[in-house]
Amino acid sequence: MNTTHVPEPHRTEQHAENQRHWRKILGIAPIVSIAFPATMYFISDEDSFEDSLFLRFITVLLPFSYSAVQYALLHTNWKSHNKPERILQSILYYTLNLLFLAFSIISILSIIAFTLAEWEDDDWENNNDPIIFSFILPSFTVPLTYLLSTSCCLVPGQIGFTDTGINVLVDILILLCSAGDLVPAFDEVKHCYYFAIISSILILIRLLREKLSPEKQSPPPTAPWRIAVFVLILISIVIAYALLAYLIMNADIFDNYSISFGKVERASFHQSPANKQLIS
């Protein structure tokens, strides 16, 4: 029986090449995950999202599948390479382990729930479900996932924010855009595409800088301000996914209930016993 022997250096080179290709795919994925849903909104008719289950599916698929894959990778790497030795390390280990797993599961459930829910298309001054799912949620969740995956070190004893130079400013602007993306969700939805465009441009700038002038060595992320930035990013992600979980739980997908921000609040108002008496 003949067996083909593959030299170990060749296997190592092939593995490194596969990793480079995978990093390239994940590198452009956040931009595509923001730009594709926005493109689907602009090329579709006003009532297309309400009538087409497939259109809703492909619109939410990329941003939430990107997040699901990234958090699954973070969960796998954190679980396999980090073993707690002390009580505080054990708390951190199991907390991040649970969070990454929860973020990945919520991302998958978001694809299902937001596809099956009806997307109502109101006028520009009110909440508009297609805009919320095409612009607001992708440009709110994807950049945060990108920052945690690329700008933070997740090694026990070295956990923190690792970027330097102009990338620090770019990352802070990305974080601010994600936070500002929620403002039009509760005010005027028509301004939300600005944040999606700005976030995509900032991520593109960061990717081009990494390609043209890569940093030779990242500084140790143990400085207090670097740990603070990491905590800020993580808290922002927790808030984002708590919001997603809230929207999923309020999505009555069997009755094709609309789950836009304002409609959830209006539905809660009308459903309370006291307000029913006032209305009657």
Swiss-Prot record:
InterPro entries: UPF0328 (IPR019081)
Protein family membership: Belongs to the UPF0328 family.
Annotated protein name in UniProt: UPF0328 protein ECU06_0020/ECU06_1700
Lineage, uppermost ranks: Eukaryota, Fungi, Fungi incertae sedis, Microsporidia, Unikaryonidae
